[in-house]
């Protein structure tokens, strides 16, 4: 014991310093080891999140592509076919043309003039209305697809446990998804009467100073079509034309449905209306309509010799020949392809899908 006490007295400072260093070193080792484990856990967590993100992107793209395929191969072709059939039913020019054809030598000049004026109004109404409807319907369905794609992203992310999306609104069920896509028929079923009436008023306003003997050139016809579209779009309340494309928000509430179901479908309609009434969509619609109007007149020019000028009366039968081109099925529809290829349209839908409100 004396030896130990002696050693302690003699080396106490060294022993204390050594013990302190060893203790500190052990503590630092434990802290470093704990920190290393935390870093490793964090790296594994980040790796899992990255893996989940890739799974989300893959599944989202697969399902989104499926929705897009359904829209392109089923929804849009059906909607356009239904639309073109309704236009033919509601704007009948064949009966007037038959009267003119069978009335040669029988009709008095005033009767003949009246029929020709009716044909003038109906032909332009039918052509411009068809062009407007096909253009806007194609854009509308693409808006639908992008909105569904956004909700699909939320659905997939929630299924994989992405916490930052767990507080989103209720998921969109398959029945609501199908109901939403089939609402594209609203234009042909419910919106058509008002659309025809207002488009015809715009045609009458623009053509009231044009006589059947007036000669129209390519530029004059193009200006006439654009003027009709402009008068139609600008007459009435702002974005009045949205009511031709889709049902009102109040109409989406079905008293026989559960509150949850009503909320889900109502949400889709609300988001769609917000997009359609935005300035960005209005700009894209205007660009698309102008592009299609120019293409339509150019097509008529190549087939009729319009470049050198043509009397309005002789132009009317040529206008009727444009109908199959305007309402052709999507795969063969030149106008739909032109719309899809517009840089402004591509950018709009890219931003719409990327920036859908979360």
From Swiss-Prot:
Keywords: Coiled coil, Membrane, Peroxisome, Peroxisome biogenesis, Protein transport, Transmembrane, Transmembrane helix, Transport. The chain crosses the membrane at residues 15-32. It is found in: Peroxisome membrane. This is Peroxisome biogenesis protein 3-1. Its main location: membrane. The keyword Plastid does not apply. InterPro entries: Peroxin-3. One of its GO terms (cellular component) is peroxisomal membrane. The keyword Protein transport applies. Residues 33-62 form a coiled coil. The lineage of its organism: Eukaryota, Viridiplantae, Streptophyta, Embryophyta, Tracheophyta. It comes from Arabidopsis thaliana. Belongs to the peroxin-3 family. PANTHER family: PEROXISOMAL BIOGENESIS FACTOR 3 (PTHR28080), PEROXISOME BIOGENESIS PROTEIN 3-1 (PTHR28080:SF2).
């Amino acid at each position: 014991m004396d030896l130990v006490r002696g050693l302690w007295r003699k080396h106490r400072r060294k022993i204390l310093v050594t013990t302190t260093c060893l203790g500190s070193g052990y503590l630092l080792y434990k802290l470093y080891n704990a920190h290393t484990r935390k870093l490793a856990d964090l790296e594994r967590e980040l790796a899992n999140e990255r893996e989940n993100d890739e799974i989300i992107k893959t599944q989202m793209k697969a399902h989104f592509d499926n929705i897009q395929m359904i829209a392109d191969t089923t929804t849009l072709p059906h909607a356009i076919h239904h639309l073109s059939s309704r236009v033919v039913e509601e704007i009948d020019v064949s009966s007037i043309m038959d009267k003119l054809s069978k009335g040669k030598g029988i009709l008095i000049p005033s009767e003949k003039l009246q029929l020709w004026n009716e044909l003038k109004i109906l032909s332009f109404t039918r052509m411009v209305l068809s062009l407007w409807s096909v253009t806007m319907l194609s854009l509308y369905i693409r808006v639908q697809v992008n909105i569904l794609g956004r909700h699909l992203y939320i659905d997939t992310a929630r299924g994989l446990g992405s916490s930052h999306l767990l507080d989103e609104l209720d998921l969109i069920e398959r029945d609501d998804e199908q109901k939403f896509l089939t609402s594209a028929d609203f234009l042909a079923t419910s919106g058509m009467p008002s659309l025809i009436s207002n488009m015809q008023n715009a045609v009458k306003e623009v053509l009231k100073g044009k006589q059947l003997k007036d000669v129209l050139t390519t530029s004059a016809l193009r200006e006439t079509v654009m003027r009709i579209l402009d008068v139609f779009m600008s007459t009435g309340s702002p974005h009045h034309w949205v009511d031709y494309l889709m049902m009102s928000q109040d109409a989406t509430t079905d008293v026989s449905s559960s509150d949850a179901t009503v909320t889900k479908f109502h949400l889709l309609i609300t988001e769609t209306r917000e997009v359609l009434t935005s300035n960005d969509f209005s700009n894209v619609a205007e660009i698309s309509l102008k592009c299609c109007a120019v293409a339509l007149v150019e097509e008529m020019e190549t087939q009729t010799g319009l470049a050198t000028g043509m009397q309005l009366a002789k132009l009317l039968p040529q206008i009727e020949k444009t109908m199959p081109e305007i309402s052709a099925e999507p795969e063969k529809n030149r106008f739909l392809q032109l719309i899809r290829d517009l840089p402004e349209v591509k950018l709009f839908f890219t931003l719409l899908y990327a920036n859908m409100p979360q």
